[in-house]
């Protein structure tokens, strides 16, 4: 489902984008962000995508991050074996460097961001949303590892750091689908959970 024909958006005033567009996203109650390629996510360089993430947050809608099937296996491997590459892939988000095909669209989006939340707030919001998704994906991946691999996986420590930074220590103490062979996430600077 689409809410706006972006090719005719220049006919709408900036105030519309700050109100009606956000209300449309809120009415739908859900935005799906297709993060591809995950190592250098194109949506993080596109002004429209970042604007939609802001509107999603401000309207109280749910954001779901999806990877294409062709990216999923590589992302899962990185969760377990190269967690830092995932952190690096999202750390470079900067709304000020985002682009749009139409200069008028870019000007409109920048104007709305400047008049509203501001660049720093939007950058922080996007990073928080992506880090939440990374943590959720990591918890799911940890639960799927077999017991012997799980107990030795660097993912335990990586998730501990990430969950601690997000204030989600309760989730570190109670991993999903806990069973007799599921190990709690380790949080550096504290006892093993």
Regions found by a protein language model. Give the residues of each.
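The feature represents the membrane-entry module of six-transmembrane cation channels
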Residues: 1-165
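A detector of tandem-repeat and repeat-rich interaction/domain scaffolds
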Residues: 147-193
């Amino acid at each position: 489902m689409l809410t706006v024909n972006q090719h005719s958006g220049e006919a709408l005033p900036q105030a519309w984008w700050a109100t009606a567009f956000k209300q449309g996203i809120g009415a739908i109650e859900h935005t799906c962000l297709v993060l591809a390629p995950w190592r250098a996510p194109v949506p993080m360089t596109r002004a429209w995508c970042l604007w939609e993430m802001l509107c999603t947050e401000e309207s109280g809608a749910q954001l779901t991050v999806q990877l294409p099937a062709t990216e999923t296996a590589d992302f899962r491997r990185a969760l377990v074996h190269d967690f830092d590459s995932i952190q690096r892939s999202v750390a470079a988000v900067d709304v000020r460097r985002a682009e749009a095909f139409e200069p008028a669209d870019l000007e409109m989006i920048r104007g709305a961001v400047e008049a509203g939340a501001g660049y720093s707030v939007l950058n922080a919001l996007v990073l928080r949303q992506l880090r939440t998704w990374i943590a959720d994906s990591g918890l799911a991946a940890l639960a799927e590892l077999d017991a012997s691999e799980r107990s030795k996986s660097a993912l335990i420590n990586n998730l501990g750091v990430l969950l601690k930074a997000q204030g989600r220590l309760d989730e570190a103490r109670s991993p999903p689908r806990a069973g007799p062979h599921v190990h709690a996430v380790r949080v550096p600077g504290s006892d093993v959970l």
